[in-house]
Structures are given as structure tokens and as C-alpha cells.
């Protein structure tokens, strides 16, 4: 699970999609979306700690799109978030695409949950485009979620000049600094994020912490 869905505009879109999904289920109506939309929706429910709904939408999505790497990865993350490493491993080992950056990040998450830091780092080092913002953000949030903010910053620092004005970059750096206890350094970044997206509850929460 990543925090990409909390960025400006996307959280609201997914809130609306969740309302549509729940209304359709309540009325026993079909609800069709692309695999990536359903994966994002499952992730959105997960970030809200609504895991029953998150699992429900992931499993519903996999019935519609059984070969979707995106949905399988999200399904694996949900199991990892709930301490079900064995099931997560089974899903990860059966991913249709094991070489994508997203597949490597979720496998690294599993390795870290098993205490295999060196193996996780070696795997992440095989990601080809380490300067791609999406890859940097995914890896950084994974490290941060697993309690390694310094490892996250090691991925963030090399691309600082290129992405220092990007909302996604600023958000993960702010969260990493907060994770290291560097609250004073994080506050100006949360203020920048609020200027970019004044209606984002996570940014206000970050500032209030």
C-alpha cells in the first residue's frame, strides 16, 4: 500500500468511486472498472483502515480481472498490512509480472517483514529507473512504512533537484522527516503542501502532529 492516493484530487475521486461501489453493491447492481481503478480503490479503503472493504474490493476486482498484476499486488499489500505473510508470499510468487518496479517493491516489503534487509536492498537495486518519481515514491513509502526512514531518504536525496517542486516528492520527504523525529524540518514542507492542496486532510494532519 502506498500513499499516492492521498495526493491532490485523487482522494476525492476515490471517495466518489467508493460511494458508487457501495451503492451498486447495496442494490445488487454490476460495478465495472478497470483493474488499476479497482486496485487504487482497494488501496484507498486500506489507507482508511477499512480492511473488510479493502479485501472485498480487491477480491471483487480479481474476479473481473484475474490476471491483473496491479490488483494482485494490492491484494498482497493488504495481507502484509494484516500480518498474513504466508498468504502475501503465495500471491507475490504467482504474480504475472515479477520484473516490474511495483512487483519488486512489494516483494521487498515482504522481505523486510521477514527481517531480510540485505535481500530487500539487493532486490530494489535491480530496479532499472531509479530516477523515476513513481518508483522513488513507492520505494520511499515502503521503507518508511517498515520503519526505515533513512533508507527512504537515501532514495529521495539523489533526485532532489529534479523533483523538489513535485507534490508527491515533497509529501514523502515531509513524512520521512517526521518519521525521523525532525518535526521542525517537516513543518515547512507540510505548509508548502497545504498551499498546493488546501483541502487535503493528510497534510493538515501532518502539520498538526
Regions found by a protein language model. Name each.
Residues 66, 98-100, 130-132, 163-164, ...:
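Short coil turns that delineate tetratricopeptide repeat
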Amino acid at each position: 500500500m502506498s500513499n499516492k492516493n492521498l495526493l491532490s484530487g485523487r482522494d476525492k475521486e476515490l471517495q466518489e468511486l467508493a460511494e458508487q461501489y457501495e451503492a451498486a453493491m447495496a442494490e445488487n447492481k454490476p460495478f465495472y472498472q478497470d483493474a488499476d481503478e479497482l486496485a487504487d480503490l482497494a488501496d484507498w479503503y486500506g489507507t482508511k483502515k477499512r480492511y473488510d472493504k479493502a479485501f472485498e474490493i480487491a477480491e471483487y476486482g480479481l474476479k473481473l480481472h484475474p490476471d491483473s498484476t496491479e490488483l494482485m499486488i494490492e491484494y498482497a499489500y493488504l495481507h502484509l498490512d494484516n500480518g498474513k505473510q504466508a498468504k502475501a508470499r503465495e500471491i507475490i510468487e504467482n504474480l504475472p509480472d515479477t520484473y516490474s518496479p511495483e512487483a519488486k517493491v512489494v516483494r521487498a516489503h515482504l522481505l523486510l517483514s521477514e527481517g531480510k534487509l540485505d535481500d530487500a536492498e539487493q532486490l530494489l537495486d535491480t530496479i532499472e529507473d531509479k530516477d523515476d518519481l513513481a518508483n522513488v515514491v513507492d520505494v520511499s513509502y515502503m521503507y518508511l512504512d517498515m520503519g526505515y526512514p533513512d533508507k527512504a531518504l537515501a532514495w529521495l536525496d539523489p533526485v532532489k533537484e529534479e523533483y523538489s517542486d513535485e507534490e508527491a516528492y515533497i509529501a514523502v520527504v515531509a513524512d520521512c522527516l517526521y518519521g525521523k523525529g525532525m518535526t521542525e524540518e517537516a513543518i515547512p514542507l507540510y505548509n508548502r503542501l497545504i498551499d498546493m492542496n488546501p483541502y487535503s486532510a493528510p497534510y493538515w494532519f501532518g502539520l498538526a502532529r
